[in-house]
Amino acid sequence: MAKTLYEKVWDSHIVAAPEGEAPLIYVDRHLVHEVTSPQAFSGLKVAGRKLRAPEKTFATMDHNTSTKSASLDALSPMARTQVETLAQNCKEFGVRLYDIHHKNQGIVHVMGPELGITLPGTVIVCGDSHTATHGAFGALAFGIGTSEVEHVMATQTLRQLKAKTMKIEVRGLVADGITAKDIVLAIIGKIGMDGGTGYVVEFCGEAIAALSMEGRMTVCNMAIEMGAKAGMIAPDQTTIDYLEGREFAPKGEAWQQAVAAWKALKSDEDAMFDAHVVLEASDIAPQLTWGTNPGQVVAIDQCVPNPEDETNPTVKASIEKALDYVALTPGTQMTDVSINKVFIGSCTNSRIEDLRSAAQQAKGRKVAAGVTAIVVPGSGLVKEQAEAEGLDKIFIDAGFEWRLPGCSMCLAMNDDRLEAGDRCASTSNRNFEGRQGRGSRTHLVSPAMAAAAAIAGHFVDIRKPY
């Protein structure tokens, strides 16, 4: 029977499937951070249990860390308690930890792939909603809740219902200047923020195959923003080239065996999907969100939508509510929307390719008066490489702040947050009300679009001179 990529990975990880119950699947990698792990570790202690597979558990500090200082003194009391608790738990249970002083510390969904922890055909979980990022390697990766974190710690397994399958095909190649962020925002704009609910999505097509691993991670990262359980891209030579030599990737004969298996890991030609969505790559322009969810998105050469043009009363009410919050007028050209904050970072867009793209816009220019812009590399390794290439100097000379790795302004959980009324061009993944700070307004864009907005003081079409 023909199978999809998802079905192949799923079937190979079933431990038990009792009739009438959710199957029990095996977990190959468990990624842990300071926010969703304390209660899980506590649960193990109360029950007197050990960690089932410490060698398959990897921890980092990212959500509540400071991007201004690596000192514990720079943290709030709550944040300090969280990172110190994680350190103690990792020591007690024998978990490998990349703490704030480790050169490989970073956002969990950045450092995992770059260390080779993420491998094709594996099942990866983390107490974080953007775990789907790792699906870019042909892994089945999804976020779990704290009680599930404890279950995986104790058993290295998880009960899960099998999802439906959706194929999202982006035909042809995108035009120059169009990035992975534009592709995935265009997809979400087409199917909506709940269009993928109940599905595991496989992204494919010429435009997807042409992406680097960094670009593929951006696409899969935002699968959750279309409601999907996970996003996956079949591994190919680009995947293999990226993984070769990484710290936790197989070595020697094991590498050759792995590569042979990975090359065969793809959906069968006659595999049936429950849903199929097609986009033409040539139709995709630079994208940016205007509202309060990632599905409220338009192209840069379009206007703020008018709710009066919407016939569906529910959608109309949603548009009206969003416009009221973001304080935009229907019919306004998106290029006329001014910003006063810029955030380049997050698990969506903080990798070396993203920083190069932003630096290309910033080079030889200056951040506009009244705009504060920060650049937060996704990991210590990304920061090191960017500095070796001189990207930090380009940003600093242009007036951007160059920070330490961390989740930063993606969410209002640490000290990097917006004030009420701030309008931010952000390379993150969510533009919900208050996501970056109470009363703040977020517009999701690519790194190049964010950097260009910082220079111009408003959104611009990077395909044209500005």
Curated annotation (Swiss-Prot):
It catalyses: (2R,3S)-3-isopropylmalate = (2S)-2-isopropylmalate. [4Fe-4S] cluster binds at residues 347, 407, 410. It comes from the Bacteria. GO terms for molecular function: 3-isopropylmalate dehydratase activity; 4 iron, 4 sulfur cluster binding; metal ion binding. Its cofactor is [4Fe-4S] cluster. Pathway: Amino-acid biosynthesis; L-leucine biosynthesis; L-leucine from 3-methyl-2-oxobutanoate: step 2/4. Catalyzes the isomerization between 2-isopropylmalate and 3-isopropylmalate, via the formation of 2-isopropylmaleate. Belongs to the aconitase/IPM isomerase family. LeuC type 1 subfamily. HAMAP family: LeuC_type1. Heterodimer of LeuC and LeuD. This is 3-isopropylmalate dehydratase large subunit. It comes from Shewanella loihica (strain ATCC BAA-1088 / PV-4).
